Amino acid sequence: MTFAEFEQKYKDFDVMTASFEDELSYRQDQFDMFETEGFTDTFQTPYEECSEYNGQKYELVRRASYVKGDCDMECLPQWIIKFADGKEVNAYPEDICKLEVNFREIEEKKFN
């Protein structure tokens, strides 16, 4: 699913009022959309936590799962990634997804 397809499908969607099944479908489509749009080569978090890994390559291990206890449903999508030193972390789209990282860089340039 591309970003444009995702935007069209969910233009009137409200996650706060969605049924569990609809939210699950929404989260799956978020995963699909970000995976279709691609990942960055290096980790680049805007947050302080794990910022020591900024600029480092990572291995994509798997999708994070609320069923496996990786995170809460509302925190999805996230992916489990692994750094060269063996540390595994949950990564948000803004840490590793091209779409989000590029958007953030554009927004930061507007204000700097």
Question: What residue spans do the PLM features occupy?
Answer:
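Acidic, low-complexity, intrinsically disordered interaction modules
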Residues: 10, 15-104
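Short acidic DE-rich linear segments
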Residues: 109-112
